[in-house]
A protein has these predicted regions:
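ABC ATPase NBD coupling module
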Residues: 31, 87-105, 126, 132-136, ...
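Short helical segment in ABC ATPase nucleotide-binding domains corresponding to the A-loop/adjacent helical element
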Residues: 117-126, 136, 140, 244
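Conserved signature/switch motifs of ABC ATPase nucleotide-binding domains
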Residues: 154-157, 175
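Helix-to-loop junction immediately C-terminal to a conserved catalytic motif
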Residues: 70
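Conserved ABC ATPase "signature" region
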Residues: 132-151, 203
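Catalytic Walker B motif of ABC-type/P-loop ATPase nucleotide-binding domains
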Residues: 180-183
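Conserved ABC transporter NBD signature motif
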Residues: 78-89
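The feature captures the beta-strand-to-loop junction immediately N-terminal to the Walker
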Residues: 55-57
Length: 287
């Protein structure tokens, strides 16, 4: 048994892929010779098929951890595994980016000069493993499943921000990834659009059962979407506590009115506030 802090399996299905295991990971930045420890001996397991919400103070190292999983940044020490296969470790400090892990960015990454359907089809077309017809058939089908029928031949700038977010998620799923990595994807959306996107994401998740590693500062978002929350410490980043969200899936927004939802919210807010105050006090001392 790994020493990693482990979340309970979200789904009892041995066929699911995308289990993440993070073992004793350290990340140290060294700008101008001044070492900054961003991640400090982080241990965590995320079972395949789980929606894992990562919550913690701003600047604590959450995105650094996501970037290491994605293969954007190296780690200083430790190991990260995907389905028991090494992504990065002592002999390989930086993971190879791959179609099995796809990032949905905070600021979006659609090509504005391509139509939405062409954006969705772009990745598989570049890979060249399927025929163009098969790729576009799949793209049309997935856009329809995501409520995007009628938007296929529009450009990203011609649809709402919420619909653009859906297009980005569909594009991310086109290569059948094991893991979707979200870095505050709905931060810029208004509350009503964000609510619609939450329910749309869950609908997409229920159909695809992909592992989701999702960074957010929005506690309501975290509890509504997640099977459980990983509360991170102030910098350097490591898990402080796992909060189980024992509200059955599928969910809709009626769960927000339940006493149990508010109980989880109170527990989570207390934990995050404690770490945010530590981060603030550390900043005051540094200043």
């Amino acid at each position: 048994m790994s020493a990693a802090m482990k979340t309970n399996a979200a789904l009892d299905n041995d066929t699911l892929k995308g289990a993440i295991r993070i073992e004793d990971v350290v990340k140290i930045y060294d700008p101008d010779g001044a070492a900054v420890v961003a991640v400090d001996h982080c241990n965590l397991e995320v079972p395949a098929g789980e929606i894992c919400m990562i919550v913690g103070p701003s600047g604590c190292g959450k995105t650094t951890l996501l970037n290491a999983i994605a293969g954007f940044h190296s780690i200083t020490s430790g190991s990260i595994y995907l389905d028991d296969e090494l992504l990065c470790g002592p002999s390989k400090p930086k993971a190879d980016p791959g179609a099995d892990r796809v990032v949905v960015f905070q600021n979006g990454a659609l090509f504005p000069w391509k139509t939405n359907i062409d954006n969705v089809a772009f990745g598989p077309l570049m890979q060249g493993k399927l025929s163009k017809k098969d790729i576009y058939d799949k793209a049309y089908s997935m856009m329809a499943d995501a409520g995007l029928s009628g938007s296929e031949h529009s450009f990203p700038g011609e649809i709402s921000s919420g619909l653009r977010r859906r297009v980005e998620i569909v594009r991310a799923l086109m290569n059948d990834p094991k893991v979707l990595l979200f870095d505050e994807p709905y931060r810029a959306l208004d509350s009503l659009t964000k609510s619609v996107m939450h329910e749309a994401l869950l609908e997409i998740y229920y159909k695809n059962k992909v592992t989701i590693f999702f960074i957010t500062h929005d506690l309501e978002e975290a509890i509504f979407l997640g099977h459980r929350l990983i509360i991170m410490t102030s910098r350097p980043c490591k898990p402080k506590k796992i909060v189980e969200v024992d509200i059955p899936h599928p969910r809709d927004y009626s769960v927000l009115t339940s006493p149990h939802f508010h109980k989880i919210m109170a527990e989570t807010k207390a934990l995050v506030t404690e770490e945010a105050l530590k981060a603030f006090e550390a900043g005051e001392k540094e200043g």
